[in-house]
Amino acid sequence: MKDKTRNFQLIIFGATGFTGQIATKYIDHHYPNLKWAIAGRNKDKLEDLANLCKNNKPDIVIGDSGNKAELCHIASITKVVLSFAGPFNKYSNLLVECCLNEGAHYLDITGENIWVKDLIDRHHEAAEKNGVKIVPSCGYDSIPSDIGSFFSQRSLDKKILSIDCYQSGGGGVSGGTIESAFSMMEYKTQNKLGHTFLLNPKNSYSNIQREKSKDKFSIKKIKHFNTWSAPFVMAPANTRVVRRSAALFDMRQNGYGEQFVYNEFMELKKYTSALIVSTSLVMLGLIISLPFRRLFRPLFTKPGNGPSEKTQDNGWFKSKFIIKTEDNKTYISKMYGKGDPGYKST
């Protein structure tokens, strides 16, 4: 990071969006001494949001996602930029570039792995050289999966053969998340969606790992929990992130295991529930893969809208990890969270 005095410790970009508003209120409530600001293109909306903050009212910075000068100004006056401006492949490319140039760390909550792959290809070497941290996917996608796997391995202090993660939870979906799903199918490299090691460095996985890491679509009984597994909608995002983390640790001689394999599923109590979820995901996949998918977009939640406060408060998530080690032992670890996983918990 460039050695310069900065006005703020944190700037939230895209603060007036659905998830950005939640983050703004959270920061105001929990960090009364933080030097921070909220940023976006609409001054009136930013002022209205800032006026809702009663403990630590943020400053306001104007910045449009298509205006490089404004974005670079934002990056030059803060240590960290936290972006909620999705779809990120449309609205955060210039922001990441400005953060890299101005020496500000960048974080977001994207689940758009194809876009993340582009970030890695374009910026990884420069970010490493400049000491800038570019950290996508810092929400429910993919923190529980990534951190849960990390702490599972570190707490055992053993080399691992495999981790199977089973996700369950309750909550809602915002229009921005749905828009991101539609957007990714229109992205220039959408044909890479099935690449199970999309985010890995070159030559960082074996044929055995590739064979055991194929995306899973079947329904199975989970003997350890007496429940059922189904395909998890965010597994294609989370698995790629965990596999990249494992590969990066391995490059630093501190890996999870030489042939480490990670897979992820949804956990449900009943077979019928697993069947319904699996069928629904197939239908959703067909809808967003159709050439005329945009005709179906009005059927879903609009950008800017999302779960009610009651739904967010009553939401929850559980991440369960079945870990098999190289000494042929099996362990179980669990992670819990209160609040809607994609919003309040995030």
PLM ranges: what are they?
Residues M1-N7:
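A short, basic/flexible loop-to-alpha-helix module at the beginning of a structural domain
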Residues N7, R154-T346:
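C-terminal catalytic/substrate-binding lobe primarily of soluble NAD(P)-dependent oxidoreductases
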Residues F8-Y31:
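N-terminal Rossmann NAD(P)H-binding glycine-rich loop of SDR-like oxidoreductase domains
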Residues Q9, K79-V80, H105:
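Structural motif
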Residues P32-K45:
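Conserved glycine-rich Rossmann-like NAD(P)H-binding loop of the short-chain dehydrogenase/reductase
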Residues I62-Y91:
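Conserved Rossmann-fold cofactor-binding substructure of NAD(P)-dependent oxidoreductases
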Residues P87-S204:
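Glycine-/Pro-rich loop/turn segments that contact NAD(P) or position catalytic residues
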